[in-house]
């Protein structure tokens, strides 16, 4: 029997407000434990919440960017549960009347077709504190308590780990581009839970659902979904009963581990938040926020393909972050060579950034300097291989490519006469190569080119070297 997985994601994004959702405490990351707190976010008796208007602005902005309907009237609710990181013993969230509903994101499948993943709702809520487990016991840091979140709940429209990862990547790029969240998964400002079930292929009835937590990267999400799908199928095939439960992803061992049985909505005893009024929104307010939404990543990618004639794949990679997209666009315009700009950013520069765990906005050089490097190569001043050495030096020092080329004497040798002398000497020193070429071994040409480039320390123009090697070898063959 063939099975298929049914996947939905619940994504929490911390909003980029300067203060918390119901008080004036800072949302800055990394403060000493329990220093960004007050009676409101600690839930002390007599303290009353006052909703931060910026939270509503950002929630609506996210909803519009994600093709949602905006509810003209929505309400805050109390979600009741007892846990050490929840100081009030309830969380202020939204239940029946979320601020946004019925949106979607389009992802691209491997075959090039587009698939629409529905967004059921977006609601605003406050974050909980953070538990720190030590050998001596468990400590609680309430700095994060009251930090504003939006929870984006997808419909169960995904059917593979790759689709889930692509959905999350696209969601992240949209939220970051409209600047409602910095979406730093490593700092916990973007967190994802996956709901997974498995059913026989073609069946309409959904299987027993498991919720997976603790996935802090796109790769973790893919691995966790793949593992949990496999676990469900194996249990079904053995005839064992699946439990509706919450599990966590164990990154070290690449498995999911049971945490608790999955709660139902009535376990939380939702009821309206009595200390806050309803959120009422009119069309003028929505239109004002709509006007602040910039060009979205998928729109920018489509424009890049049309304007710069780069492949769709390049455009999709370059627009994953706005910083990379802007760096590419400026470089392409300054250099006049969009494909070279794309190749450098997606190739050597991305490799260097990944090795140092850096983002493009941390580069020591700018688009003007990268365009200068591209022009040095296109003009024949330096070779592409020398360019790779230059870009590493730019990455490490921030120096301009012209300065690096002059300081290190890297100007390409285009003197055909001088190169010919080296070519003839290399051929004279390697008579066996001529014999091999006569016997049909064309690879020796590359061997001889390599020797010439080594002799000239990479400075000889490789096009001239290739031409002269071919001419001289064919004379002798």
Swiss-Prot record:
It catalyses: L-glutamyl-tRNA(Gln) + L-glutamine + ATP + H2O = L-glutaminyl-tRNA(Gln) + L-glutamate + ADP + phosphate + H(+); L-aspartyl-tRNA(Asn) + L-glutamine + ATP + H2O = L-asparaginyl-tRNA(Asn) + L-glutamate + ADP + phosphate + 2 H(+). Its EC number is 6.3.5.-. Keywords: ATP-binding, Ligase, Nucleotide-binding, Protein biosynthesis. The keyword Nucleotide-binding applies. SMART domains: GatB_Yqey. Transmembrane segments: none annotated. One of its GO terms (molecular function) is asparaginyl-tRNA synthase (glutamine-hydrolyzing) activity. The keyword Cell inner membrane does not apply. It comes from the Bacteria. GO terms for biological process: glutaminyl-tRNAGln biosynthesis via transamidation; translation. Belongs to the GatB/GatE family. GatB subfamily. This is Aspartyl/glutamyl-tRNA(Asn/Gln) amidotransferase subunit B. The lineage of its organism: Bacteria, Bacillati, Bacillota, Clostridia, Eubacteriales.
